[in-house]
Amino acid sequence: MCQVEEDYNGLECNQEKIPVSGLNRKCMKCKEGTAVLIIRVSDAFCRSCFKEYFIHKFRAMLGKNRVIFPQEKVLLAVSGGAASCTMLSQVQEGLSRDAPKKLRFMPGIVYIDDGGACGRSEDERQTSISQLKNIFTQTGFPYFIVPLEKVFSLPTSVLVPGTSDPDPSNPCYKQAVDKYLKEKQKLREEEAVCAVAQLNLEDSAYLPEHKLALQRLFSSLKTLSAKQEMLQTLRQHLILHVARENSYSKVMMGESCSRLAVKLLSNIALGRGAALASDTGFSDPRFGDVVIVRPMRDYSSKEITFYNRMFHVPSVFIPGLDTKSHDKASIQRLTESFVTNLQADFPSTVSTIYRTSEKLHTVRPPQSQSTEPEPASKCLLCLCALDTTADKASAFHATLISEQLSQLRLQEGSVDLVAGSSDQCCVEDQTCGTSGCCSSKRTPVQQDLKTLLCYSCRLTVKDMAAVNTLPPYILTEAEKRQRRSQMKVEISEYLLEEDQD
């Protein structure tokens, strides 16, 4: 039987790995050329066949799903890493004149500069931005470079799901293709040049107070796991805002198969099991009017590295929050280390996890199948469906009861403080709430936000020392939803139920 802290070093030494000879192997596809790389044990490719295989996989992923329509504006989220830069290269290759199956959408690029959250200096951030600008300019696509500090000037409309009504002019994919082939886009190149010139003037500056506010926000988060989750959420909000402001209906993410395998396991550990289908699937329609697609999800990190190395795809290394951190620094980092080490000895680990994620689907509640869900039915931060309406016999309900009992004294003290200050107002000779000052600027506390969050986002907010460090658009939308819920409770006796005439 297995024992805790048992030494397996002796067994590891006795296990001999079977050497795989790669000398003078022929390409598995053309059977003529000499193989220059081996993706898996039996998959040896020559240079030309590997390029054809790599490009075909990207086109097949888009063609199989048929989510992106001709003449549709698609925003490419590029982080500077190997996977996202490869995605940019594939789009550029697919839009070229020599492409056999030419892509027909209109791309744009967005880069979120999160150096302020990662503790990078201004010079380091500008160096990375200049390197990325050189890559973006060579593509000829319009691009946006947005600092993470911009989240403190976002509107509350970012947290409101848009309508996902289909375009009546493009009722199906076939008709959209026929319309594209009939129309000639004579001014497309001129428009692209003008767009690049305009977007070069995109204001990438930020206010000093926003930089300090961002530092306070991430300083209030106690764990690295919570910091990474918050960074991912804020980055997603910025990308969504850029897409809506510039009429992009699709957003491409460069997440590879290896990255999604790690994300699947780490999200389960973080309590995001109900949102796995949206977080790891090919398309993510949670935002309604903007759909996130992941065309790189069939590529492993090994394939991407080989392709970038052989065909000189430029990329920029930008340190993140978990750079140079140890394996147990966060749940995400620990999961990545676990999957990577397991993949080294068992090459089918990543593919097995990835194939499992393909079978996941989100079941919509019966009341939301015919109509669009209300904003109150979605999480305030990640905009996924709330998974906190569980039965009393569930593990989630038992966790809530345990938490309430452990914090009973603390909650009673906070209630007394709120009750003692409820009649005071910042305006003289007026009661609280009549002038609108206290009611409109009241900062939500942790307990108020929990009712608006999914289980995973509750854990993230729970790790915060001060909730008032969140960006203003989140606090404003939270207060708005709380008011609507309170108003609904007050007039509930006058409302007709759905089963009543």
Swiss-Prot record:
Subcellular location: Cytoplasm
GO terms (BP aspect): protein urmylation; tRNA thio-modification; tRNA wobble position uridine thiolation; tRNA wobble uridine modification
Protein name listed in UniProt: Cytoplasmic tRNA 2-thiolation protein 2
Gene this protein is translated from: ctu2
Function: Plays a central role in 2-thiolation of mcm(5)S(2)U at tRNA wobble positions of tRNA(Lys), tRNA(Glu) and tRNA(Gln). May act by forming a heterodimer with ctu1/atpbd3 that ligates sulfur from thiocarboxylated urm1 onto the uridine of tRNAs at wobble position.
One Pfam family per UniProt: CTU2
GO molecular function: nucleotidyltransferase activity; sulfurtransferase activity; tRNA binding
Matching PANTHER family: CYTOPLASMIC TRNA 2-THIOLATION PROTEIN 2
Presence of keyword Ubl conjugation: no
Species the sequence originates in: Danio rerio
